[in-house]
Protein backbone atom coordinates (compact mmCIF):
# COMPACT_ATOMS: atom_id res chain seq x y z
CA UNK A 1 0.00 0.00 0.00
CA UNK A 2 1.10 3.56 -0.50
CA UNK A 3 1.53 4.34 3.16
CA UNK A 4 3.29 1.23 4.33
CA UNK A 5 6.73 2.67 3.88
CA UNK A 6 9.46 0.51 5.36
CA UNK A 7 10.62 1.70 8.79
CA UNK A 8 14.34 2.23 9.32
CA UNK A 9 13.95 0.90 12.86
CA UNK A 10 14.32 -2.74 13.96
CA UNK A 11 11.02 -3.41 15.69
CA UNK A 12 10.03 -5.69 18.53
CA UNK A 13 6.58 -5.56 20.10
CA UNK A 14 6.21 -6.29 23.80
CA UNK A 15 3.19 -7.43 25.79
CA UNK A 16 2.13 -3.91 26.76
CA UNK A 17 1.39 -3.03 23.15
CA UNK A 18 4.31 -0.64 22.83
CA UNK A 19 6.77 -0.90 19.99
CA UNK A 20 10.39 -1.02 21.20
CA UNK A 21 13.11 -0.27 18.68
CA UNK A 22 16.87 -0.19 18.71
CA UNK A 23 16.64 3.54 18.03
CA UNK A 24 17.80 5.69 20.94
CA UNK A 25 16.45 9.15 21.63
CA UNK A 26 19.68 10.84 22.61
CA UNK A 27 17.85 13.77 24.20
CA UNK A 28 16.78 11.39 26.96
CA UNK A 29 19.33 8.59 26.61
CA UNK A 30 16.68 5.87 26.49
CA UNK A 31 15.23 3.44 23.92
CA UNK A 32 12.37 4.76 21.81
CA UNK A 33 9.04 3.33 22.99
CA UNK A 34 6.44 3.87 20.27
CA UNK A 35 2.76 3.17 20.57
CA UNK A 36 1.83 0.24 18.36
CA UNK A 37 -0.10 1.72 15.43
CA UNK A 38 -0.79 -1.74 14.05
CA UNK A 39 -2.76 -2.66 17.17
CA UNK A 40 -5.20 0.20 16.60
CA UNK A 41 -5.29 -0.46 12.86
CA UNK A 42 -6.25 -4.08 13.44
CA UNK A 43 -9.42 -2.92 15.21
CA UNK A 44 -10.41 0.14 13.19
CA UNK A 45 -9.22 -0.42 9.62
CA UNK A 46 -11.20 -3.58 8.69
CA UNK A 47 -14.64 -2.01 9.34
CA UNK A 48 -13.57 1.30 7.79
CA UNK A 49 -12.17 -0.35 4.67
CA UNK A 50 -15.30 -2.49 4.43
CA UNK A 51 -17.59 0.54 4.49
CA UNK A 52 -15.45 2.36 1.93
CA UNK A 53 -15.49 -0.71 -0.30
CA UNK A 54 -19.27 -1.20 -0.13
CA UNK A 55 -20.30 2.41 -0.73
CA UNK A 56 -17.54 3.08 -3.25
CA UNK A 57 -18.19 -0.08 -5.24
CA UNK A 58 -21.95 0.49 -5.42
CA UNK A 59 -21.59 4.16 -6.33
CA UNK A 60 -18.96 3.69 -9.02
CA UNK A 61 -20.65 0.62 -10.52
CA UNK A 62 -23.84 2.66 -10.77
CA UNK A 63 -21.95 5.38 -12.65
CA UNK A 64 -20.43 2.79 -15.00
CA UNK A 65 -23.79 1.15 -15.74
CA UNK A 66 -25.54 4.45 -16.42
CA UNK A 67 -22.72 5.74 -18.61
CA UNK A 68 -22.70 2.55 -20.71
CA UNK A 69 -26.42 1.73 -20.82
CA UNK A 70 -28.00 5.19 -20.88
CA UNK A 71 -25.40 7.64 -22.06
CA UNK A 72 -23.77 5.41 -24.71
CA UNK A 73 -20.51 7.36 -24.20
CA UNK A 74 -21.27 10.01 -26.80
CA UNK A 75 -19.50 12.81 -24.92
CA UNK A 76 -15.82 13.34 -24.16
CA UNK A 77 -16.74 14.14 -20.57
CA UNK A 78 -18.60 10.85 -20.19
CA UNK A 79 -15.57 8.90 -21.44
CA UNK A 80 -13.41 10.52 -18.78
CA UNK A 81 -16.07 9.92 -16.12
CA UNK A 82 -16.18 6.25 -17.08
CA UNK A 83 -12.42 5.94 -16.78
CA UNK A 84 -12.46 7.78 -13.46
CA UNK A 85 -15.04 5.33 -12.13
CA UNK A 86 -12.91 2.41 -13.37
CA UNK A 87 -9.88 3.91 -11.61
CA UNK A 88 -11.83 4.06 -8.38
CA UNK A 89 -13.00 0.47 -8.85
CA UNK A 90 -9.42 -0.75 -9.35
CA UNK A 91 -8.51 1.08 -6.17
CA UNK A 92 -11.51 -0.33 -4.31
CA UNK A 93 -11.13 -4.02 -5.14
CA UNK A 94 -7.87 -4.12 -3.22
CA UNK A 95 -9.47 -2.93 0.03
CA UNK A 96 -10.83 -6.32 1.22
CA UNK A 97 -7.30 -7.73 1.14
CA UNK A 98 -5.85 -4.75 3.02
CA UNK A 99 -8.66 -5.10 5.58
CA UNK A 100 -7.84 -8.77 6.12
CA UNK A 101 -4.13 -8.00 6.31
CA UNK A 102 -4.68 -5.25 8.89
CA UNK A 103 -6.67 -7.59 11.13
CA UNK A 104 -4.34 -10.57 10.78
CA UNK A 105 -1.38 -10.82 8.41
CA UNK A 106 -0.75 -11.10 4.68
CA UNK A 107 -1.63 -14.68 3.73
CA UNK A 108 -2.03 -14.31 -0.04
CA UNK A 109 1.59 -14.77 -1.13
CA UNK A 110 4.12 -12.59 -2.92
CA UNK A 111 2.46 -12.69 -6.37
CA UNK A 112 -0.88 -11.43 -5.03
CA UNK A 113 1.00 -8.83 -3.02
CA UNK A 114 2.53 -7.37 -6.18
CA UNK A 115 -0.68 -7.73 -8.20
CA UNK A 116 -2.94 -5.92 -5.75
CA UNK A 117 -0.31 -3.31 -4.98
CA UNK A 118 -0.16 -2.68 -8.73
CA UNK A 119 -3.95 -2.31 -8.93
CA UNK A 120 -3.86 0.03 -5.94
CA UNK A 121 -1.20 2.27 -7.50
CA UNK A 122 -2.75 2.24 -10.98
CA UNK A 123 -6.15 3.13 -9.54
CA UNK A 124 -4.58 5.87 -7.43
CA UNK A 125 -2.62 7.51 -10.24
CA UNK A 126 -5.37 6.87 -12.80
CA UNK A 127 -7.87 8.68 -10.61
CA UNK A 128 -5.58 11.70 -10.31
CA UNK A 129 -4.90 11.86 -14.04
CA UNK A 130 -8.56 11.60 -15.05
CA UNK A 131 -9.49 14.34 -12.58
CA UNK A 132 -6.89 16.48 -14.35
CA UNK A 133 -8.38 15.58 -17.75
CA UNK A 134 -11.87 16.45 -16.51
CA UNK A 135 -10.56 19.80 -15.33
CA UNK A 136 -8.96 20.54 -18.71
CA UNK A 137 -12.12 19.32 -20.45
CA UNK A 138 -14.27 21.69 -18.40
CA UNK A 139 -11.85 24.53 -19.12
CA UNK A 140 -12.09 23.97 -22.88
CA UNK A 141 -15.88 23.62 -22.78
CA UNK A 142 -16.41 26.90 -20.92
CA UNK A 143 -13.49 29.15 -21.82
CA UNK A 144 -12.94 28.01 -25.42
CA UNK A 145 -16.47 26.89 -26.29
CA UNK A 146 -16.20 27.24 -30.07
CA UNK A 147 -12.87 25.42 -30.26
CA UNK A 148 -14.22 22.72 -27.93
CA UNK A 149 -16.90 21.71 -30.45
CA UNK A 150 -14.17 20.53 -32.83
CA UNK A 151 -11.54 19.32 -30.37
CA UNK A 152 -13.66 17.46 -27.81
CA UNK A 153 -14.48 14.37 -29.86
CA UNK A 154 -15.05 10.79 -28.78
CA UNK A 155 -11.95 9.68 -30.69
CA UNK A 156 -9.85 12.24 -28.84
CA UNK A 157 -11.29 10.98 -25.57
CA UNK A 158 -10.42 7.35 -26.33
CA UNK A 159 -6.86 8.20 -27.41
CA UNK A 160 -6.15 10.40 -24.39
CA UNK A 161 -7.66 7.77 -22.08
CA UNK A 162 -5.36 5.04 -23.44
CA UNK A 163 -2.34 7.32 -23.05
CA UNK A 164 -3.43 8.20 -19.52
CA UNK A 165 -3.67 4.54 -18.52
CA UNK A 166 -0.19 3.90 -19.92
CA UNK A 167 1.21 6.81 -17.90
CA UNK A 168 -0.56 5.52 -14.77
CA UNK A 169 0.95 2.06 -15.26
CA UNK A 170 4.40 3.56 -15.81
CA UNK A 171 4.09 5.66 -12.64
CA UNK A 172 3.11 2.51 -10.72
CA UNK A 173 6.12 0.42 -11.80
CA UNK A 174 8.51 1.44 -8.95
CA UNK A 175 5.89 0.66 -6.33
CA UNK A 176 5.22 -2.76 -7.88
CA UNK A 177 8.89 -3.71 -8.27
CA UNK A 178 9.92 -2.85 -4.71
CA UNK A 179 6.82 -4.27 -3.03
CA UNK A 180 7.04 -7.79 -1.65
CA UNK A 181 5.69 -10.12 1.00
CA UNK A 182 8.15 -10.37 3.87
CA UNK A 183 8.11 -11.68 7.43
CA UNK A 184 8.32 -9.02 10.13
CA UNK A 185 7.88 -9.63 13.85
CA UNK A 186 6.74 -13.24 13.19
CA UNK A 187 3.98 -12.15 10.76
CA UNK A 188 3.97 -11.71 6.98
CA UNK A 189 3.56 -8.16 5.70
CA UNK A 190 2.93 -6.90 2.15
CA UNK A 191 4.60 -3.56 1.66
CA UNK A 192 7.21 -1.54 -0.23
CA UNK A 193 10.88 -2.03 0.62
CA UNK A 194 12.60 0.76 -1.24
CA UNK A 195 16.34 1.33 -1.27
CA UNK A 196 17.12 4.75 0.20
CA UNK A 197 17.52 6.54 -3.14
CA UNK A 198 14.44 4.95 -4.69
CA UNK A 199 12.32 5.75 -1.64
CA UNK A 200 13.19 9.45 -1.93
CA UNK A 201 12.53 9.41 -5.68
CA UNK A 202 9.19 7.64 -5.31
CA UNK A 203 7.98 10.03 -2.62
CA UNK A 204 8.94 13.10 -4.67
CA UNK A 205 7.32 11.62 -7.79
CA UNK A 206 4.15 10.85 -5.87
CA UNK A 207 3.94 14.40 -4.53
CA UNK A 208 4.57 15.94 -7.94
CA UNK A 209 1.95 13.78 -9.67
CA UNK A 210 -0.53 13.72 -6.80
CA UNK A 211 -0.26 17.25 -5.45
CA UNK A 212 1.87 19.77 -7.36
CA UNK A 213 0.73 18.93 -10.92
CA UNK A 214 -3.03 18.77 -10.24
CA UNK A 215 -2.82 21.90 -8.08
CA UNK A 216 -1.04 23.82 -10.84
CA UNK A 217 -3.47 22.68 -13.55
CA UNK A 218 -6.55 23.29 -11.43
CA UNK A 219 -5.46 26.80 -10.43
CA UNK A 220 -4.77 27.75 -14.05
CA UNK A 221 -7.94 26.17 -15.46
CA UNK A 222 -10.37 27.26 -12.78
CA UNK A 223 -8.99 30.80 -12.79
CA UNK A 224 -9.90 31.01 -16.47
CA UNK A 225 -13.26 29.37 -15.84
CA UNK A 226 -14.16 31.79 -13.05
CA UNK A 227 -13.17 34.81 -15.11
CA UNK A 228 -15.36 33.59 -17.96
CA UNK A 229 -18.35 32.75 -15.78
CA UNK A 230 -18.19 36.08 -13.97
CA UNK A 231 -18.69 37.82 -17.31
CA UNK A 232 -21.95 35.96 -17.91
CA UNK A 233 -25.28 37.58 -17.14
CA UNK A 234 -27.28 34.70 -15.69
CA UNK A 235 -26.43 35.10 -12.00
CA UNK A 236 -28.22 32.07 -10.59
CA UNK A 237 -26.67 29.60 -13.02
CA UNK A 238 -23.31 31.31 -12.65
CA UNK A 239 -23.27 30.84 -8.87
CA UNK A 240 -24.33 27.20 -9.22
CA UNK A 241 -21.49 26.51 -11.64
CA UNK A 242 -18.94 28.25 -9.40
CA UNK A 243 -20.05 26.19 -6.40
CA UNK A 244 -19.68 22.90 -8.28
CA UNK A 245 -16.30 23.88 -9.70
CA UNK A 246 -14.94 24.82 -6.28
CA UNK A 247 -16.34 21.59 -4.84
CA UNK A 248 -14.51 19.53 -7.44
CA UNK A 249 -11.25 21.30 -6.70
CA UNK A 250 -11.44 21.55 -2.94
CA UNK A 251 -12.68 18.04 -2.15
CA UNK A 252 -9.82 16.33 -3.98
CA UNK A 253 -7.19 18.33 -2.09
CA UNK A 254 -9.11 18.03 1.17
CA UNK A 255 -8.92 14.25 1.00
CA UNK A 256 -5.45 13.70 -0.51
CA UNK A 257 -3.25 16.66 0.48
CA UNK A 258 -2.81 15.55 4.12
CA UNK A 259 -1.55 12.14 2.99
CA UNK A 260 0.90 13.56 0.46
CA UNK A 261 2.32 15.96 3.04
CA UNK A 262 2.69 13.22 5.67
CA UNK A 263 4.55 10.81 3.39
CA UNK A 264 6.87 13.66 2.38
CA UNK A 265 7.62 14.40 6.05
CA UNK A 266 7.96 10.69 6.80
CA UNK A 267 10.47 10.10 4.01
CA UNK A 268 12.61 13.13 4.81
CA UNK A 269 12.42 12.94 8.61
CA UNK A 270 16.00 13.99 9.21
CA UNK A 271 15.79 16.93 6.82
CA UNK A 272 12.69 18.29 8.59
CA UNK A 273 14.07 17.52 12.07
CA UNK A 274 11.44 14.85 12.79
CA UNK A 275 13.70 11.88 13.49
CA UNK A 276 13.18 11.88 17.28
CA UNK A 277 11.03 9.26 18.98
CA UNK A 278 7.94 11.40 19.57
CA UNK A 279 7.87 12.76 16.02
CA UNK A 280 8.28 9.37 14.35
CA UNK A 281 5.50 7.94 16.49
CA UNK A 282 3.19 10.80 15.50
CA UNK A 283 4.12 10.36 11.83
CA UNK A 284 3.24 6.66 12.01
CA UNK A 285 -0.21 7.51 13.32
CA UNK A 286 -0.69 10.39 10.87
CA UNK A 287 0.25 8.17 7.92
CA UNK A 288 -2.42 5.63 8.80
CA UNK A 289 -5.12 8.25 9.40
CA UNK A 290 -4.43 10.34 6.29
CA UNK A 291 -4.28 7.35 3.95
CA UNK A 292 -7.62 6.10 5.25
CA UNK A 293 -9.02 9.59 4.64
CA UNK A 294 -7.66 9.56 1.11
CA UNK A 295 -9.22 6.17 0.42
CA UNK A 296 -12.67 7.50 1.17
CA UNK A 297 -12.34 9.96 -1.73
CA UNK A 298 -13.27 7.19 -4.15
CA UNK A 299 -16.71 7.16 -2.49
CA UNK A 300 -17.12 10.89 -3.01
CA UNK A 301 -16.33 10.94 -6.73
CA UNK A 302 -19.74 9.59 -7.86
CA UNK A 303 -21.44 12.29 -5.79
CA UNK A 304 -19.32 15.15 -7.10
CA UNK A 305 -19.19 14.23 -10.77
CA UNK A 306 -22.57 12.62 -11.24
CA UNK A 307 -25.21 12.80 -8.53
CA UNK A 308 -25.26 16.61 -8.39
CA UNK A 309 -26.80 16.67 -11.89
CA UNK A 310 -30.53 16.46 -12.43
CA UNK A 311 -29.86 14.67 -15.71
CA UNK A 312 -28.02 11.90 -13.89
CA UNK A 313 -30.90 11.40 -11.48
CA UNK A 314 -33.25 11.09 -14.45
CA UNK A 315 -30.97 8.52 -16.07
CA UNK A 316 -30.74 6.70 -12.74
CA UNK A 317 -34.52 6.26 -12.72
CA UNK A 318 -34.41 5.11 -16.34
CA UNK A 319 -31.74 2.56 -15.47
CA UNK A 320 -34.01 1.21 -12.73
CA UNK A 321 -36.89 0.92 -15.18
CA UNK A 322 -38.91 3.74 -13.64
CA UNK A 323 -41.30 5.79 -15.75
CA UNK A 324 -40.33 9.45 -15.52
CA UNK A 325 -40.72 12.57 -17.58
CA UNK A 326 -38.37 12.81 -20.57
CA UNK A 327 -35.19 14.82 -20.30
CA UNK A 328 -35.46 18.48 -21.15
CA UNK A 329 -32.65 18.44 -23.69
CA UNK A 330 -31.04 15.81 -25.89
CA UNK A 331 -27.69 14.55 -24.72
CA UNK A 332 -24.48 14.78 -26.76
CA UNK A 333 -26.13 14.62 -30.11
CA UNK A 334 -28.23 11.65 -29.10
CA UNK A 335 -31.84 10.91 -30.04
CA UNK A 336 -33.71 13.99 -31.14
CA UNK A 337 -30.71 15.85 -32.55
CA UNK A 338 -31.02 16.42 -36.27
CA UNK A 339 -28.09 17.39 -38.46
CA UNK A 340 -28.25 20.83 -39.99
CA UNK A 341 -30.62 22.25 -37.37
CA UNK A 342 -29.74 24.99 -34.90
CA UNK A 343 -30.40 22.72 -31.93
CA UNK A 344 -28.83 22.51 -28.51
CA UNK A 345 -26.08 19.98 -28.04
CA UNK A 346 -24.67 19.41 -24.58
CA UNK A 347 -20.91 19.44 -24.10
CA UNK A 348 -20.84 18.52 -20.44
CA UNK A 349 -22.34 15.03 -20.17
CA UNK A 350 -23.24 13.86 -16.68
CA UNK A 351 -21.64 16.91 -15.13
CA UNK A 352 -24.54 19.06 -16.32
CA UNK A 353 -26.69 20.54 -13.62
CA UNK A 354 -29.76 21.08 -15.75
CA UNK A 355 -28.56 19.53 -18.97
CA UNK A 356 -28.53 22.70 -21.04
CA UNK A 357 -25.98 22.68 -23.78
CA UNK A 358 -24.40 24.87 -26.40
CA UNK A 359 -26.43 26.12 -29.31
CA UNK A 360 -24.51 25.72 -32.56
CA UNK A 361 -24.07 29.00 -34.34
CA UNK A 362 -24.38 31.18 -31.25
CA UNK A 363 -21.75 33.65 -30.18
CA UNK A 364 -19.37 32.23 -27.55
CA UNK A 365 -20.61 34.44 -24.72
CA UNK A 366 -24.22 33.47 -25.29
CA UNK A 367 -23.37 29.79 -25.34
CA UNK A 368 -21.48 30.05 -22.08
CA UNK A 369 -24.65 30.86 -20.23
CA UNK A 370 -26.00 27.47 -21.21
CA UNK A 371 -22.97 25.75 -19.75
CA UNK A 372 -23.22 27.36 -16.37
CA UNK A 373 -25.44 24.63 -15.04
CA UNK A 374 -22.42 22.34 -14.72
From Swiss-Prot:
GO terms for cellular component: cytoplasm; dendrite; external side of plasma membrane; fibrillar center; membrane; neuronal cell body; perikaryon; perinuclear region of cytoplasm. Glycans are attached at residue 14. Changing residue 133 to F: No effect on expression at the cell surface, nor on CCL2 or CCL13 cytokine-mediated signaling pathway; the nucleotide substitution creating this missense variant may lead to abnormally low levels of isoform A at the cell surface, while isoform B levels are similar to the wild-type protein. This is C-C chemokine receptor type 2. Belongs to the G-protein coupled receptor 1 family. GO terms for biological process: blood vessel remodeling; calcium-mediated signaling; cell chemotaxis; cell surface receptor signaling pathway via JAK-STAT; cellular defense response; cellular homeostasis; chemokine-mediated signaling pathway; chemotaxis. PROSITE patterns: G_PROTEIN_RECEP_F1_1 (PS00237), G_PROTEIN_RECEP_F1_2 (PS50262). It is linked to Polycystic lung disease: An autosomal recessive disease characterized by pulmonary alveolar proteinosis, marked peribronchovascular and parenchymal lymphocytosis, peribronchiolar pulmonary fibrosis, progressive diffuse parenchymal lung cyst formation and enlargement, progressive obstructive airflow limitation, and recurrent secondary infections. Additional features may include digital clubbing, allergies, and atopic dermatitis. Key functional receptor for CCL2 but can also bind CCL7, and CCL12. Also transduces signaling mediated by CCL13. Its binding with CCL2 on monocytes and macrophages mediates chemotaxis and migration induction through the activation of the PI3K cascade, the small G protein Rac and lamellipodium protrusion. Also acts as a receptor for the beta-defensin DEFB106A/DEFB106B. Regulates the expression of T-cell inflammatory cytokines and T-cell differentiation, promoting the differentiation of T-cells into T-helper 17 cells (Th17) during inflammation. (Microbial infection) Alternative coreceptor with CD4 for HIV-1 infection. Changing residue 61 to R: In PCLUD; likely pathogenic; loss of CCL2 or CCL13 cytokine-mediated signaling pathway; loss of expression at the cell surface; contrary to wild-type, does not rescue CCL2 cytokine-mediated calcium mobilization and cell migration, when transfected in CCR2-null monocytic THP-1 cells. Residues 71-80, 137-153, 227-243, 310-374 are cytoplasmic. It is a multi-pass membrane protein. The modification Sulfotyrosine is found at residue 26. Signal peptide: none annotated. Changing residue 119 to R: In PCLUD; likely pathogenic; loss of CCL2 or CCL13 cytokine-mediated signaling pathway; loss of expression at the cell surface; contrary to wild-type, does not rescue CCL2 or CCL13 cytokine-mediated calcium mobilization and cell migration, when transfected in CCR2-null monocytic THP-1 cells. It is found in: Cell membrane.
Amino acid sequence: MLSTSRSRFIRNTNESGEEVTTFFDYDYGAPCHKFDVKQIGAQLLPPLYSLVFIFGFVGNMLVVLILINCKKLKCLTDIYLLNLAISDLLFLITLPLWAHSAANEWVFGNAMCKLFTGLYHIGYFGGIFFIILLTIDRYLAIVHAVFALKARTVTFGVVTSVITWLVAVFASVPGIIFTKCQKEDSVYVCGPYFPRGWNNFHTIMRNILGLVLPLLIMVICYSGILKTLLRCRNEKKRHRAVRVIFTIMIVYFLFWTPYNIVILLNTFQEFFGLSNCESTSQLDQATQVTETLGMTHCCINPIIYAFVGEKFRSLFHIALGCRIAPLQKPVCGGPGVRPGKNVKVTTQGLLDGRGKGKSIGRAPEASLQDKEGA
